[in-house]
Amino acid sequence: MDIRAAEISAILKDQIKNFGQEAEVTEVGQVLSVGDGIARVYGLDNVQAGEMVEFENGTRGMALNLETDNVGVVIFGADREIKEGQTVKRTRAIVDAPVGKGLLGRVVDALGNPIDGKGPIQFTERKRVDVKAPGIIPRKSVNEPMATGLKAIDALIPIGRGQRELIIGDRQTGKTAIALDTILNQKPLNAQPDEKIKLYCVYVAVGQKRSTVAQFVKVLEEQGALEYSIVVAATASDPAPMQYLAPFTGCTMGEYFRDNGMHAVIIYDDLSKQAVAYRQMSLLLRRPPGREAYPGDVFYLHSRLLERAAKLNETQGAGSLTALPVIETQANDVSAYIPTNVISITDGQIFLETDLFFQGIRPAVNVGLSVSRVGSSAQTKAMKKVAGKIKGELAQYREMAAFAQFGSDLDAATQRLLNRGSRLTELLKQPQFSPLKMEEQVCVIWAGTNGFLDGLPLNKVRAFEDGLLSLLRGKHADLLNTIRDTRDLSDDSAAKLKAAVEGFAKTFS
């Protein structure tokens, strides 16, 4: 056998030279057609559903339709630079987003990239945006209150940590205002050192004007609430895939707190725009349309998102994620496709009405149509005691007010009922950016249901409330502290409160 030394040495030299160098194998495909934010790609045979792919110019997309001969990719960005015949490569990663406390105080887009000009985000891990919701075993029934600071909601439609409560109403009825007040109301809780008390906030803006989002962030900053909040924005000028993805990204960021034994609330503002973006994508991907041209799985789109809000049991760390989805109706039509879907998924709804808004009843909550299916079990004892009475009296008032329009001669009892009801309705009004603590709400509602407002003219109710609150905060701070600490209105506290309110009522004119 003939051994050639030169040949062997050449092979050895070559192997030594290339030692440690690994060839990178990427699976690439070709763009067949592109338009309207959708690219058809040939050749990505092993791509996964929901996988991120990268185009030649660095633009990213997500593989949604896996067909026999091509892949339908939605593009996260402008499709102007993408041409037919360009290469597309797999990233082998399902769409994910950064999570952690480093995101607090920041504004990010639907992929988790910062858009607030404050530099890169400090994060340690990334999580998939579309994960399975917790099963039945890790969950626990809702048992802690999630205070919004609004009397009309905390007393009549209470929300608990881990609940999904829908905020539904026409445009310009104050849906975002309720969400904003809820975030601002968490400021005292987030000042506490205990992580079990804190409630972090995630606000997802979908399809809104950039000016509106900027204004929202400005208010959060001015009120000192941005430091415990994350804002995820996919505005009206962003592509439909970004608007579709933003709620899932926000949810993943909120789940970080839930899974680490902390508490968070997430506001989706609003899901009707996400459904419209999903409809646009589905129709362009040639998926068959259903009712109102929405695809058949639009219910599943919202159910898999909202089911991720949960209260976990002690073995899982007892964390929670509360969801406040917002839905915009057209002309108060709650029976449209998307509103009925989301109503059936959530644990109750806060129904806002244009008529009430223009009558000056703000927040414009229709107490008759609004419900909370699980929140009452999370109400504090003190609030339960006073709220039960106000619910009954308002229900009677609504019934009588309808009849009173026809008859002019009303008996004294009916007149008394109408008188009390109109004053309680006045009492539930609340200006924006002025959330009340639980103990303050209890005292004010107690005064209303115990007849201290009955003799007042309607236009003096607000002044009475303000005066009573400043008296309680000043001279009776110990009473407020007792109610806050015990979460109950004991007979002793009720007697002290009665004496304080009676004394104030005598001096009030």
Swiss-Prot record:
Assigned GO CC terms: plasma membrane; proton-transporting ATP synthase complex
Record: residues binding ATP: G169, D170, R171, Q172, T173, G174, K175, T176
Ion transport is among the record's keywords: yes
Lipid bilayer topology: Peripheral membrane protein
InterPro entries according to UniProt: ATP_synth_asu-like_sf (IPR023366), ATP_synth_asu_C (IPR000793), ATP_synth_asu_C_sf (IPR038376), ATP_synth_F1_a_nt-bd_dom (IPR033732), ATP_synth_F1_asu (IPR005294), ATPase_a/bsu_AS (IPR020003), ATPase_F1/V1/A1_a/bsu_N (IPR004100), ATPase_F1/V1/A1_a/bsu_N_sf (IPR036121)
Predominant location category: membrane
Database matches in Pfam families: ATP-synt_ab, ATP-synt_ab_C, ATP-synt_ab_N
Localization: Cell inner membrane
EC number: 7.1.2.2
Record key words, sorted: ATP synthesis, ATP-binding, Cell inner membrane, Cell membrane, CF(1), Hydrogen ion transport, Ion transport, Membrane, Nucleotide-binding, Translocase, Transport
Recorded superkingdom: Bacteria
GO MF annotation list: ADP binding; ATP binding; proton-transporting ATP synthase activity, rotational mechanism
Positions bearing the site annotation: Required for activity: S370
Reaction equations catalysed: ATP + H2O + 4 H(+)(in) = ADP + phosphate + 5 H(+)(out)
Function: Produces ATP from ADP in the presence of a proton gradient across the membrane. The alpha chain is a regulatory subunit.
Family: Belongs to the ATPase alpha/beta chains family.
Subunit architecture: F-type ATPases have 2 components, CF(1) - the catalytic core - and CF(0) - the membrane proton channel. CF(1) has five subunits: alpha(3), beta(3), gamma(1), delta(1), epsilon(1). CF(0) has four main subunits: a(1), b(1), b'(1) and c(9-12).
Protein name as catalogued: ATP synthase subunit alpha
Organism: Bradyrhizobium sp. (strain ORS 278)
